C-alpha cells in the first residue's frame, strides 16, 4: 500500500536493516505472573525465528502439541526479540535438556493461566539507523519532537500482509467465496489481513481529509470534501490536533478502555490532544460498533459485509512513549528507543520518520 504520511517534512535519508543487531523488541506483559499454578511462563530471547517457528521448536522438544503453548503476540523474525510463552508446568523438567543456537530461556515462573493472544501491554523497541549524516540526524530530532507532541497513525505494518504482500488479496477472495482454505487458523489469519488492508485504506483517506483541512480554505476544501458542509469544515479546522475527529466518530479511551461515540466535538478534540482518547478505526466484520453521521460516510467505503469474521475497533492513532534518540557521529548511526502499545508496528514509526517506504533487507 502506498502510505500517506501525516507529517509534511521531506524524506530523510538513512539506512535501516531489520536484523537482530539493529532491531530489538521486548514484550511487556499485561500483568505480573503469580509464581504459582499449572502453567510455566518462559521469558525467551530468540533471533532469526518467527514466533510460530519458536512454538514448533518448543513443542517438538517437549513432545506436546503446538496449541498447548501460549503466547501473547507474534514477534518479528528478522530481529532479536524477548517474549513470554507458557507451557504446561508438568513438562518443565524437559527444559533442562533444551538447547538451540537461536533460542535462550532467560526466566521461568509459574502462573495460573495459559498466556492468550493479546495478553500483553505493549512492546519496547531499540532500533539502529545507519548511514546517517549529521544534518539528517538534526532533521530526525525535529521530526521526533513532532511525534512526541502529536503521535502517529496506527497503520498496520508490511509484516501483516505476508512475504509477498498479498495476504489481504487472498483474504478478500475467501470472504467473497472465491477461494477456500481448509485450515481454520490459516483462514482467520488471511481474513484478518484483509480487515487490516481495509483499515489502512480508511486511515489513509482520513489523513488525506485532515491534510485538505490544513491546507485549504473552507470554501476550497468543500470542493475536495463535498460530503461535509462548509460550516462543519470550519469547525473541524479549529481542532488543534492534525488528525481531525469527525461528528459520529467512534472514540477509544487511550490506551485501554471503552469505546464511545463522539458528541461534544470541542471537548473530544481537547481530550485527543491531551492523549486521553483517540479515534478508533473499524476492522470490518460482524458485531462491530458502527460510527455515525459524517464519520460513517467516510467509513462506509471500507466496510465489506461479506466478511463473516467478528469485527472490532482498532486505535487509529497512538502516542509513542519513552522516546529517546542519540546520534553517534563517528559511526554515522542513530539509535532509537521507544515503547508502543500492543498491536502497533515500529516499522510504521520508522517510515513516518523517514517519510518514505523503508526497504527491508
UniProtKB/Swiss-Prot annotation:
Keywords: Isomerase, tRNA processing
Enzyme category, top tier: isomerase
Reactions performed catalytically: uridine(13) in tRNA = pseudouridine(13) in tRNA
Function: Responsible for synthesis of pseudouridine from uracil-13 in transfer RNAs.
Name this polypeptide is given: tRNA pseudouridine synthase D
Active-site feature positions: 76 (nucleophile)
GO MF, one annotated term: tRNA pseudouridine(13) synthase activity
One GO CC annotation: cytosol
InterPro entries cross-referenced by the UniProt entry: PsdUridine_synth_cat_dom_sf, PsdUridine_synth_TruD, PsdUridine_synth_TruD_CS, PsdUridine_synth_TruD_insert, TruD_catalytic, TruD_pseudoU_synthase
Residue intervals passing through the bilayer: none
Gene: truD
GO biological process: tRNA pseudouridine synthesis
One Pfam family cited in the UniProt record for this chain: TruD
Species: Wolinella succinogenes (strain ATCC 29543 / DSM 1740 / CCUG 13145 / JCM 31913 / LMG 7466 / NCTC 11488 / FDC 602W) (Vibrio succinogenes)
Annotated ranges, domain TRUD: 151-318
Family to which the UniProt record says this protein belongs: Belongs to the pseudouridine synthase TruD family.
Enzyme Commission number(s): 5.4.99.27
